[in-house]
């Protein structure tokens, strides 16, 4: 008798619990379906490292497209489409958009990191990021790193924005040659950016000899942050060995002759350094 009563009570308890859970889930689902968006919360996850994008800018993107989000039912907001919309902005590396039970539409994103700025004589002014994306110059943003000047042969027009590798394997010989040189030049600047000494030392990379014949890349010069020296690196090929040669020169010759021993240093030729006072 007691055992039968216990079983009955257990069944009744589980039945009531199932009814409660079913009602609760239906109520929660209906409530979520009818819940309105009360806030768009934008979080730039790497804002401490760089500030190309602010929450206000993201909200302005939505406003410019006349997206009425606040006051709209959360269930009717296409979060995947919003993610695609945010990712299409050049400075955005990753984006995640989702809703929460507190009535918020959450936008979380990270930014691309520019590693080099081009400001050339032939009218180009843009950034290249660490993941190989070409971005336009931004008025109020500062990138701490070498600026590339001179006359640089590019595989694209001055207003291009997008991935650099779009030009890889281009069948047009001139485009492919310019792309190959640009990649080598960017890799050189990345190397400088990754080395504490050279990053502090080199402030400008100047491209010269852009009229080099077929099969030859332009020469490059580097300008130190301090002093009046100009250093001819020559071809960008073999830059690690050339910089090692320059460092050895500074450690030995400059130690005896002084920093201003020469105004022009030429590293272009193998196994020698040519200096002009």
Walk through the language-model features, giving the residues of each.
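Charged, solvent-exposed interaction patches on well-folded alpha/beta domains
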Residues: 1-44, 64-73, 77-88, 93-277
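An acidic helix/loop motif centered on a single conserved Asp/Glu
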Residues: 54-63
């Amino acid at each position: 008798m007691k055992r039968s009563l216990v079983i009955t009570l257990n069944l009744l308890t589980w039945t009531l619990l199932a009814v409660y859970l079913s009602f609760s889930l239906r109520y929660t689902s209906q409530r979520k379906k009818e819940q309105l968006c009360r806030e768009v919360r934008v979080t730039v996850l790497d804002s401490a490292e760089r500030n190309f994008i602010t929450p206000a800018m993201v909200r302005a993107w939505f406003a410019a497209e006349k997206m009425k989000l606040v006051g709209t039912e959360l269930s009717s907001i296409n979060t995947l489409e919003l993610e695609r919309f945010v990712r299409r902005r050049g400075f955005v590396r990753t984006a995640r958009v989702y809703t929460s039970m507190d009535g918020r539409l959450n936008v979380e994103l990270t930014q691309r990191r520019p590693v080099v700025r081009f400001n050339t004589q032939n009218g180009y002014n843009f950034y290249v990021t660490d993941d190989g994306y070409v971005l336009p110059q931004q008025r109020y943003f500062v990138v701490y790193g070498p600026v590339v000047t001179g006359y640089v042969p590019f595989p694209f027009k001055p207003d291009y924005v997008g991935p650099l590798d779009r030009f890889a394997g281009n069948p047009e010989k001139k485009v492919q040659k310019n792309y190959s040189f640009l990649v080598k030049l960017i890799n050189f600047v990345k190397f400088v950016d990754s080395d504490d000494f050279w990053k502090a030392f080199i402030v400008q990379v100047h491209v010269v000899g852009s009229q080099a014949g077929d099969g030859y890349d332009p020469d490059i010069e580097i300008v130190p942050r301090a002093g009046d020296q100009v250093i001819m690196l020559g071809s960008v090929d073999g830059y690690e060995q050339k910089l090692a040669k320059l460092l050895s020169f500074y450690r030995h010759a400059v130690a005896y002759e002084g920093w201003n021993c020469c105004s022009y240093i030429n590293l272009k030729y193998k196994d020698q350094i040519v200096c002009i006072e």
